[in-house]
């Protein structure tokens, strides 16, 4: 009860900040990949993966080379990001556990201060915190492989839904188009790519098994190479949707006043990677872009944690960080 009262009190302090004047605070677009290793982009050191849009984003912004997650598993990592707390503090530290309704997220603070807050794509945070957003367009996860090897719906192993919806990104641009134009935007855009299952034929020019870069701890077999090639294909598909978002921001003439952050929730879904404490499991790509504010084509070796994301977004919005946040 005390936590609930504290949350209500905090939001009541923010509400008076609203006014009828034009709100020129920056838009914030947060893009989160699903099971992408930190070094599997062209701009982070893997020239074998085709990621032209993310490479351009990095060239126009800053890449952090020492960015780490609090945990190397999907939903606990996301819960940690949205609450700026460590997994053992979220009560959602296990895979598929929902965030409890009494957890404070940075999103409701942005919303209370006047931001239009939306989420599109993979959700994976439970039903209790959906109301922190003005709108949530959750991706269809039919055929999405769970750790048991079963699909996410009805226990059947099926293919992902047809077409662009396989990526989880098909509603990214539509939800941006639907925003009210008189409010600053916060968008949580979450992909299903490059999470398993993998489908062949998703690209006109797929990556070739003989061209992939295998880590030294992976057996160099044709099976491994084919698996990595399909993983690369999903990264390239994700990159295409990132490009679509950038194009839409330009179309709406808000790109210059939009802060973009791109990360992954954990490492690649291969042995010794995801669910481990190796860099390939818990380290993340971390690319920021904000024209006229972030030095283009720059790198930082500063140590960054995913719990720092929420305080950074709040600072961009001119808001204070709650004391219960760890970042």
Which role fits each region the language model picked out?
Residues 5-16:
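Bacterial N-terminal signal peptides
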């Amino acid at each position: 009860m005390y936590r609930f009262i504290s949350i209500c009190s905090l939001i009541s302090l923010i509400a008076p900040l609203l006014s009828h004047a034009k709100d020129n605070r920056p838009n914030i677009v947060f893009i989160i990949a699903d099971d992408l290793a930190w070094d599997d982009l062209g701009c982070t050191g893997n020239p074998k993966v085709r990621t032209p849009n993310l490479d351009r984003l990095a060239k126009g912004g800053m890449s952090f080379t020492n960015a780490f997650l609090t945990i190397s598993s999907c939903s606990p990592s996301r819960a940690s990001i949205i609450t700026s707390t460590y997994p053992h503090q979220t009560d959602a530290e296990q895979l598929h556990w929902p965030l409890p309704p009494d957890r404070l997220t940075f999103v409701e603070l942005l919303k209370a201060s006047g931001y239009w807050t939306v989420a599109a794509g993979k959700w994976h945070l439970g039903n209790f915190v959906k109301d922190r957003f003005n709108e949530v367009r959750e991706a269809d996860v039919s055929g999405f492989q769970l750790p048991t090897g079963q699909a996410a719906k009805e226990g059947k192993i099926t293919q992902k839904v047809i077409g662009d919806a396989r990526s989880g990104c098909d509603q990214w641009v539509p939800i941006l188009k639907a925003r009210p134009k008189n409010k600053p935007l916060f968008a949580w855009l979450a992909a299903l790519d490059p999470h398993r299952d993998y489908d062949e034929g998703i690209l006109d020019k797929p990556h070739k098994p003989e061209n992939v870069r295998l880590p030294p701890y992976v057996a160099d077999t044709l099976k491994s190479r084919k698996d990595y090639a399909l993983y690369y294909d999903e990264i390239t598909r994700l990159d295409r949707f990132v490009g679509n978002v950038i194009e839409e921001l330009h179309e709406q003439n808000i790109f210059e006043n939009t802060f973009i952050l791109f990360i992954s929730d954990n490492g690649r879904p291969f042995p010794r990677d995801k669910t481990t404490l190796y860099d390939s499991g818990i380290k993340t790509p971390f690319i920021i872009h904000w024209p006229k504010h972030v030095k283009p084509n720059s790198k930082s070796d500063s140590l960054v944690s995913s719990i720092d994301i929420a305080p950074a977004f709040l600072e961009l919005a001119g808001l204070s960080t709650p004391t219960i946040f760890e970042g």
